[in-house]
């Protein structure tokens, strides 16, 4: 079983799209291994973000692991296209599809890693039937759809429950948190059992490289 590593995955939803390439290079140069790509359709969540063209444009210019978070209805319609555009991991919401196992199998068939996500109102137990089938579980710590929200503390309790499920099964599944993560609460998320940290507005502001390095140091 591989060891669990702490990983920072900055969300480009909070980047400056006028200079997206520069912002990505800033976090990459700081030693950040992953990049979180939030895709929103205006149906599953109220906001619309970006989609395959942005992912396809980014892919040739970075070796970072592209962690693609689909906040879209019926994600099984598009997972193969996102994989083809350069996603390393395709992550979808349990609440967005009636065929969770089918969606997992579609992603797995592309050779990409698979993630499943739950919203704040969804209980931790919802992921239990799928733990052996996926590479990562994402627990939303805010309502998905908008950046810059405050973390919902109760959601971290779900992280602890899911980490115990993973450990009890002898798995090495990554456990990601997304929403309202800053330097002052990232250690709390790690202590609850998360090992992949999504941070958006806390990284993509002012001195981006310095912000990223501060997170990496705090997460050691």
Describe each PLM feature range.
Residues 2-91, 96-99, 106-109, 113-114, ...:
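Conserved N-terminal beta1-alpha1 strand-loop-helix module at the mouth
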Residues 6, 144-145:
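A short, mixed-charge helix-start or loop-turn motif at secondary-structure junctions
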Residues 35-38, 175-177, 199:
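Short beta-strand segments at enzyme active-site cores
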Residues 117-121:
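Short gly/ser/thr-rich secondary-structure transition/capping motifs
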Residues 143, 150-191, 195-196:
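Active-site/ligand-binding-proximal alpha/beta "capping" segment
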Residues 194-199, 205:
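Acidic, Mg2+-coordinating phosphoryl-transfer loop and its flanking beta/alpha structural elements
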């Amino acid at each position: 079983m591989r060891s669990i590593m702490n990983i920072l995955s900055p969300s480009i939803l909070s980047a400056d799209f006028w200079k997206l390439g520069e912002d990505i290079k800033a976090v990459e140069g700081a030693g950040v291994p992953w990049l979180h790509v939030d895709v929103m359709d205006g149906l599953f969540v109220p906001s619309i973000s970006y989609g395959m063209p942005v992912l396809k444009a980014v892919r040739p210019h970075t070796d970072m692991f592209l962690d693609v978070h689909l906040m879209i209805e019926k994600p099984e319609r598009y997972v193969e296209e996102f994989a083809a555009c350069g996603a390393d991991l395709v992550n979808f919401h349990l609440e967005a599809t009636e065929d969770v196992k089918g969606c997992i199998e579609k992603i797995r068939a592309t050779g990409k890693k698979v993630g499943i996500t739950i919203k704040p109102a969804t209980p931790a137990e919802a992921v239990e039937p799928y733990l052996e089938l996926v590479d990562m579980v994402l627990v939303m710590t805010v309502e998905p759809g908008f950046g810059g929200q405050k973390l919902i503390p109760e959601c971290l309790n779900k992280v602890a429950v899911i980490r115990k499920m993973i450990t009890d099964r002898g798995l090495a599944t990554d456990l990601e948190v997304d929403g309202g993560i800053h330097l002052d609460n990232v250690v709390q998320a790690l202590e609850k059992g998360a090992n992949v940290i999504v941070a958006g507005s806390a990284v993509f502001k002012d001195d981006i490289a310095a912000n990223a390095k501060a997170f990496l140091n705090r997460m050691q």
